[in-house]
Amino acid sequence: MSRERIKRELPPVQEHIDKLRKVIEEGNYYGALQMYKSISARYVTAQRFSEALDILFSGACIELEHGLVNCGADLAILFVDTLVKAKSPCNDETLDRIRCIFKLFPRVPVPPHLVDVSDDEDVQNLQESLGEARSRVENLTSFLRAAIKWSAEFGGPRTGYPELHAMLGDYLYTECPELDMVRISRHFVRAEDPEKFASMLVNFMGRCYPGEDDLAIARAVLMYLSMGNMKDANFMMDEIKKQAETKNPELSESDLIQFISYLLETLQRDALPLFNMLRVKYKSSIDRDQLLNELLDEIAERFYGVQRKNPLQGMFGDIFKMMG
């Protein structure tokens, strides 16, 4: 059958949307998912992308509204895949749809890991809850990573639309059972919302293990600097110091925090020898996390033109790592 004939024979899209909603409301969730995929594929084949997107957007929202995270995420990812096929530009209308889908992903408090290990039912309930939380995070991450990549390719900033990074960073922080602050920070430094990032780090300071707080702050500031973003790096440090005066006064005594403070002052002038001296003096603190050395190498290249021995080792040299 020719593409033109398919175009003519496809019915108005609202008929499918109404029919599929009824299928879900009748409880045939898996059947509805397969129908959403097959029907939208017919519209894509006919290059009626706008209507395919209408079907997939509706399906993702309805499935998520019914608590069907896996099904909703499948359709949400297919929605973004169709944006790419249609070469849809990154604009407010499409971003609004992505926001709508994002808001429908459930947020469920992660249960405390401390349970009575002698109670098999408690242990089983905890394992199930943690497994469900990981699944939600993986689904949301796949959707937003695809959306970030689409936005970067079709009119957004080279590293992806900032708000999408903010969405993903926030969800990872609040919903993931095992916090990965490096991964979370990668998104927040691209979110153009240093106030929110600073608030999150202050919150993290109140729940992390001793010795993790100064590392998280140092990584955040150095990530900003590796991108040449002095303004937000300084804002972050000032805001953290302000908050720590009452909540964590010992933070200012950390050698790593002292190093970051001196570094911010040094980068405001042409002072490569001083930069190198600071790295030597605070080497033991910097060596607590290899990522700090990698970021400092990138900062040396950006601010002082110092070539890295192997540029491919730089965390931010690979745009695909950024998407993680």
Swiss-Prot record:
Gene Ontology cellular component terms for the protein in this record: cytosol
Alphabetically ordered keywords of this record: Cytoplasm
InterPro entries with a match to the protein in the record: GET4, TPR-like_helical_dom_sf
Effect of loss of the gene: Strong reduction of root hair length.
Signal peptide: none
Primary localization class, coarse: cytoplasm
Biological process (GO), any one: protein insertion into ER membrane
Record-stated family: Belongs to the GET4 family.
Function according to Swiss-Prot or TrEMBL: Involved in the regulation of root hair growth.
Oligomeric and partner information: Interacts with GET3A.
Name of the protein in its database record: Protein GET4
